[in-house]
Regions:
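Short, charged, surface-exposed loops that flank catalytic or proteolytic processing sites
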Residues: 199, 261-264
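Cysteine-clustered segments with highest specificity for TGF-beta superfamily mature ligands
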Residues: 267-269
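Oxidoreductase and adenylate-handling cofactor-binding alpha/beta cores
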Residues: 253-260
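Conserved "HGTGT" condensation-loop signature of ketosynthase/thiolase-family condensing enzymes
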Residues: 2-134, 138-147, 153-240, 257, ...
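Internal, well-ordered alpha-helical scaffold/interface segments
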Residues: 250-253, 282
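A conserved active-site cap/scaffold subdomain adjacent to cofactor or substrate pockets
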Residues: 240, 244-248, 264
């Protein structure tokens, strides 16, 4: 009749213990959960994994470059945009008593690489990334009005889930027909907004998943949120903290606390899994204006968004559809290009040449021609 949902992240404790040479033990997982969910597909294809590894930042940086090209920003304009965008997140986090980092960072600090803000994958620096080195936890209790009444829980402590949607359609980033427009996200957003509008429900607060700036942008675009509306109430994952595998619960708990303070407020929360692979959205309100409705749009998305085949050409010419420059220990290590060959199929190319890495950070490479031979990068432009 009631459920307790609990989650947390203690990675900061682990890191401090390792730094100080102290023992750190995690509770052993000796029992399987009642229901275990495992994806049928992998998050990435082999070519992506070889070029970018398992860390998410490179994949999101590639998507960010495609978004930059779509919005016709110059590289400098884009760097300024990202700095200003997350400066506002930092300001909001500074006023959040639950934020992990309440320091206010300026746009200049965020966009400029430094020893404390190392570049990781262009255009992303450390302050563009989610911060998972935190000690944070949250919990929710879900129950019915009937049980709440029996327990004499006052109405002012109750918040209601109104509508939610999700997509679990999985395609590796390189095989997505449009890197900046996931079909599942469009379908899930359409259902959520149309269902809410039928009941005259309009969100007043947003908490858009903010593992990296492009995730916020994609949700904001899909939801058609005006530029002057804040996209977070917490301050976002780089500043409020991004407890690994638990941020959705953390954001929801804070949203419900905010809604409790004002009966007229309605909160919209979004979530992501993988490399902008799966998306979920939910609307909560103080007033139970509708019976809860939910939809999984996965099957519809699978029919509409088919993976683009990987290239079988070993040599030829293609067009860059996304790119980044990866860093290791604050030094550039390689440029990574997602490209489309002459047959419209996809390939991943890399270069460790310093002039190519510099070019990725000096001029727009998305849209340029790229030449390859024996499955290796030859030239750009």
């Amino acid at each position: 009749r009631a459920s307790l949902i609990v989650g947390g992240e203690a990675r900061f404790k682990m890191i401090q213990a390792l730094k100080e040479g102290l023992p750190y033990e995690e509770m052993a997982l000796t029992e399987n959960p009642d229901n275990y969910v495992k994806a049928k597909e992998d998050l990435y294809v082999a070519e992506e994994l070889d070029a970018l590894g398992m860390m998410a930042v490179g994949y999101y940086a590639i998507i960010e470059s495609a978004m930059r090209y779509k919005n016709q920003y110059s590289l400098k304009e884009h760097e300024n945009f990202l700095g200003n965008f997350y400066e506002r997140f930092s300001q909001i986090a500074s006023k959040n008593p639950h934020a992990w980092n309440q320091k206010i960072y300026t746009a200049e600090e965020i966009k400029t690489p430094s020893n404390k803000n190392q570049r990781i994958a262009y255009p992303y620096n450390k302050l563009h990334n989610t911060s998972w080195n935190v000690n944070q936890a949250s919990a929710l209790i879900l129950t019915s009005d009937e049980i709440a009444d029996k327990l004499k829980i006052p109405f002012n402590k109750r918040v209601y889930p109104l509508v939610s949607s999700e997509t679990n359609h999985m395609i590796g980033v390189i095989q997505r027909p449009d890197l900046t427009s996931p079909v599942g996200l469009k379908l899930a957003t359409k259902y959520l907004i149309e269902t809410a509008e039928k009941h005259n429900i309009k969100p007043t607060f947003y908490e858009l998943y903010s593992c990296f700036p492009v995730a916020v942008q994609l949700f904001s675009e899909a939801l058609n949120i005006p530029e002057n509306i804040d996209k977070t109430i917490t301050g976002g994952m780089p500043f409020a903290g991004g407890p690994l595998n638990n941020y959705m619960l953390h954001a929801t708990a804070q949203m419900l606390m905010r809604i409790r303070e004002n009966n007229s407020e309605v909160g919209l929360i979004t979530g992501v899994s993988g490399m902008m692979t799966k998306q979920a959205l939910a609307i909560w309100g103080k007033n139970p204006a509708m019976d809860f409705e939910s939809k999984d749009v996965t099957k519809e998305a699978e029919k509409l968004e088919l993976p683009v085949p990987m290239s079988k050409l070993s040599s030829g010419e293609g067009k860059v559809i996304g790119c980044t420059a990866l860093y290791e220990k604050n030094m550039p290590s390689k440029a990574v290009f997602y490209a489309e060959d002459s047959q419209g199929h996809r390939l991943v190319l890399t270069s460790t040449m310093s002039e190519i890495i510099k070019q990725v950070e000096a001029e727009e490479c998305v849209g340029l021609k790229i030449n390859f031979s024996n499955n290796r990068f030859v030239s750009l432009g």
